[in-house]
């Protein structure tokens, strides 16, 4: 039995959904352990493209158990809509388990999210407005509503009445916004509870039993390392921990259960929202990459900022997460350039920096130190074998391995499952 974690190594949007879908064929259980519907995972199967926000991407293989862990914050309405979306596409042969310890996004969380972002003005962090941060704030303040409360009407009513009273004071007195009617909120969430009750269980008990049965377990992170609350580019971060350590806390799984960590690396860099971005491309090359890579947010539709690959970031992510493997994605997007660059260090006030700084003030002053490599101006999207890759593409991959000391074990060069090659064994692949 083996368990693998798929982790984003950059600012999210690395292609974790595709990698999870590919590895899920050998897994009986797929687990999301943090975040909420601020995540957006895209999976292409044949000519069909599926977009998910809450349910793990491995669901498309059928006969899998998908777990939403305690570290998640769940919008019940969004989850029910996603289940309907899957049903309408004929995806029904799966089991769903929702941790009774996962927290519930309430309607006031979304309004507070928007109000707080507006108040920040030019210092906004680029939130998705889904209520993720305020829900995690209530969790940390020990006043949140959990999924387990949905199956206890009395507990749900008491918690919602108290919370709505307090949130209305905040909304009206601080933001000048309209409040909520507690009874309407209670009735709305009772309807959600009726649909979700069968799935709400103690997920950690299930995971222990699955582990003891010898099931293959795959953990799917949302967002990426640089959006991690503790290790990301704070304050431009999410409110949870997408890194490897977050999987144990956010799923209720012991560390010894984890065998391998796959760091998903986009062949170039992207970022949504504000914050420093040393290798950013703001000219024609950046526009070319954005259009060819379809770099627009799955959840927000916002255009992503684009830059060259940054191995200062990759080595930071490697250290934080303990990567055993790299899954390199969107390699085909770089196929039209004569020269490709990799950022290998930063210059800060004349000093060379090789380690990723915690200070956003320092990072904003860092200039990239680039290595240039020859590009390959040929289509690689239809290759069937590793040997068919152009030598320049192989050299690019080899240089990433040299700079990070991690093998590139998976190479993806298009959105479809067939456009993926395994170079080194991960689990049973």
Curated annotation (Swiss-Prot):
GO terms for cellular component: cytoplasm. GO terms for biological process: 'de novo' AMP biosynthetic process; IMP metabolic process. The active site is at residues 13, 41. Keywords: Cytoplasm, GTP-binding, Ligase, Magnesium, Metal-binding, Nucleotide-binding, Purine biosynthesis. PROSITE patterns: ADENYLOSUCCIN_SYN_1, ADENYLOSUCCIN_SYN_2. Homodimer. Plays an important role in the de novo pathway of purine nucleotide biosynthesis. Catalyzes the first committed step in the biosynthesis of AMP from IMP. This is Adenylosuccinate synthetase. It comes from Natranaerobius thermophilus (strain ATCC BAA-1301 / DSM 18059 / JW/NM-WN-LF). The lineage of its organism: Bacteria, Bacillati, Bacillota, Clostridia, Natranaerobiales.
